[in-house]
Curated annotation (Swiss-Prot):
Signal peptide positions on this chain: none
Positions of the catalytic residues: E215
Record protein name field: Succinylglutamate desuccinylase
HAMAP family reported for this sequence: Arg_catab_AstE
Organism of derivation: Pseudomonas aeruginosa (strain ATCC 15692 / DSM 22644 / CIP 104116 / JCM 14847 / LMG 12228 / 1C / PRS 101 / PAO1)
EC number: 3.5.1.96
Amino acid sequence: MLALGKLLDLTLAGREPTEKIQLTADGTRLHWLAEGALEVTPIGARDNGVDLLLSAGIHGNETAPIELLERLIRKVAAGTLKPAARVLFLFGNPEAIRRGERYVEQDMNRLFNGRHEEGSGNEAFRAAELERLAQVFFSKTERVHLHYDLHTAIRGSKIEQFALYPWAEGRQHSRSELARLRDAGIEAVLLQNKPGITFSAYTYGQLGAEAFTLELGKARPFGENQEVNLERLERSLELLIDGSEEQPDGSRLDGLKLFSVSREVIKHSDHFRLHLDDDVANFTELSPGYLLAEDIGGTRWVVDEVGARIIFPNPRVKNGLRAGILVVPAKL
């Protein structure tokens, strides 16, 4: 197998490869662009016009998606997975991955869409670098641009595998992309309703890609992801990469749950209190009238939505950041 197929090993060791460009036996080109960044280009006769960006490790302790990308990279390098799509593999936060920590100084997935310009440190610099790499990768016109940013969550979930679909002015959510997610094992999709500051929000809103954040289970250390079943997603990504995927049928979205954002719970001060157990699962239902959170100045978040569920509850975020999202069932 080609040395560039060991991108994770290189990243964990903090090493640059001796050869930054290598070719497989059939002519597929592997190009190491930067730390944790590998571009795969198919031979011209096989290129099907798809540009697929796969990122993982924006949070360094979310290892199951990193291991998934590593398996795909090794298959490409060994010649057992023959790409028809251009693919950019990104391990987002190398230093946090090496430390096995969510982040070193700042939550990187709050630093996109220009937020990195307001910060400093390695994670702000890396967010800017990831934006640049994505911008260059998606600069070819008249091609299909698709981005999956793969994550696992801090806590368990009533719906284990779900996606967040960004929002941008004047764009409609794609039924065929939703069908593709369903076919890959994604059980639910949260349709967002305002611009975001995540990596997928950047590639969707600024670069025009179809882009999603995928939440794929609970975060665990390397080698301890046996309970995270990514077989359907891995197979779907292989079909996308080698060009043998059947066109998703977006006319029916049976089996896919859709949600929309009702409200975000923002932590304003150190007096913020979230009235949920630390181990409450994502997508836990909350009854109307439930006092969800309180903050300084008499600020109260009381559930008044029917069918409301909580996702990403985290009272430990910095002041001014989102400490949870209330979502409700939705339709297209």
